């Protein structure tokens, strides 16, 4: 599958409301088609060589650009600004949400409120999933930049991909250390709320099955420490949108990183965490059925 179609598919499978925040790959390809091929001729190459001798390769590339190429690069820079603004905004939002969830966990534990603990840990799982989606956002956009710049270099004869990607590696949207830290803190909260001796309940017989995505026919749930709730026969079972999106995102990340066996300067780094799509599904299945019901 071509990257443009793959990107569209991934957006639909993860968080379609982020659609306009992703790389405008189709628009960049349209701009690229406006650029004449062939590398610009001997005169252009000579001009580039003269400027490179005085001011460096980046300045030389800019000086030798046609108006169409300059328009392409302006759009590319605007895309970087878009990624960074959205990514930083989400990180700031996640810092606040993480603190709020930590406070809610502490309050619920202090009151020994089983229902509130169930609600908050469901929200933590959703929150964890959304942060994984943001990591997927970073990886997809990076991959798209690498691919469109490869097309640009091939069409123009320029060699801007490597210096541009080196610049990208320093951008906020690609710097996911803080996001990774938030994800690990989120997992630590879940570890506190999901003790190892608690049996996950994801179906009526009480056996957790991470591969079973069918709707429970007669849902019931046991609460933490032996508390019970009434039968939930009238409540329609719904999987969380973030659970679905997160599993799709993790599969996408795995595919992106395994797309080529050759490691190069443009390869994505390995995932910092060790979550797989199956492990994320299992994490979801640890939440009692009532917390997967429609809100």
Swiss-Prot record:
Residues 204-216 have a biased composition (Basic and acidic residues). The gene is SPX1. Residues 197-227 are annotated as: Disordered. It comes from Oryza sativa subsp. indica. The keyword Nucleus applies. The keyword Nucleus applies. InterPro entries: SPX_dom, SPX_prot. Keywords: Nucleus. It is found in: Nucleus. It comes from the Eukaryota. The SPX domain is sufficient for inhibition of PHR2 binding to DNA. This is SPX domain-containing protein 1. PROSITE patterns: SPX (PS51382). GO terms for cellular component: nucleus. Residues 1-166 form the SPX domain. Its main location: nucleus. Involved in plant adaptation to phosphate (Pi) starvation. Inhibits PHR2 DNA-binding activity via a Pi-dependent protein interaction. Suppresses the regulation on expression of PT2 by PHR2 and accumulation of shoot Pi. Optimizes growth under phosphate-limited conditions through a negative feedback loop of the PSI (phosphate starvation-induced) signaling pathway. Regulates the expression of SPX2, SPX3 and SPX5. May be an important link between signal transduction pathways related to phosphate starvation and cold stress. GO terms for biological process: cellular response to cold; cellular response to phosphate starvation; negative regulation of unidimensional cell growth; positive regulation of cellular response to phosphate starvation; regulation of leaf development. Interacts (via SPX domain) with PHR2 (via C-terminus). Interacts with RLI1 in the nucleus to prevents its positive regulation of leaf inclination during phosphate (Pi) starvation.
């Amino acid at each position: 599958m071509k990257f443009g179609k793959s990107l569209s598919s991934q957006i639909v499978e993860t968080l379609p409301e982020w659609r306009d925040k992703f790389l405008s790959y189709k628009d960049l390809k349209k701009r690229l088609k406006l650029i004449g091929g062939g590398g610009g001729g001997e005169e252009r190459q000579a001009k580039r060589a003269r400027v490179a001798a005085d001011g460096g390769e980046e300045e030389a590339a800019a000086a030798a650009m046609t108006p169409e190429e300059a328009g392409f690069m302006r759009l590319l820079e605007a895309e970087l600004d878009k990624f960074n603004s959205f990514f930083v905004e989400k990180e700031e939002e996640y810092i606040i949400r993480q603190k709020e969830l930590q406070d809610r966990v502490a309050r619920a534990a202090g009151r020994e409120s089983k229902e509130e603990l169930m609600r908050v840990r469901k929200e933590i799982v959703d929150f964890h999933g959304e942060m994984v989606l943001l990591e997927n956002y970073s990886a997809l956009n990076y991959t798209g930049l690498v691919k469109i710049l490869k097309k640009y270099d091939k069409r123009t004869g320029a060699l801007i991909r490597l210096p541009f990607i080196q610049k990208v590696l320093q951008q906020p949207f690609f710097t996911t250390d803080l996001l990774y830290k938030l994800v690990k803190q989120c997992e630590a909260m879940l570890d506190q709320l999901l003790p190892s001796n608690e049996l996950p309940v994801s179906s009526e017989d009480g056996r957790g099955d991470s591969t079973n995505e069918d709707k429970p026919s007669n849902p019931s749930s046991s609460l933490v420490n032996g508390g019970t709730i009434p039968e939930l026969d009238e409540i329609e079972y719904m999987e969380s949108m973030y659970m679905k999106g997160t599993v799709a995102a993790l599969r996408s990340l795995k595919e992106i990183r395994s797309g080529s066996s050759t490691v190069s300067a443009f390869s994505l780094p390995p995932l910092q965490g060790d979550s797989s799509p199956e492990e994320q599904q299992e994490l979801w299945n640890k939440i009692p059925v009532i917390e997967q019901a429609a809100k």
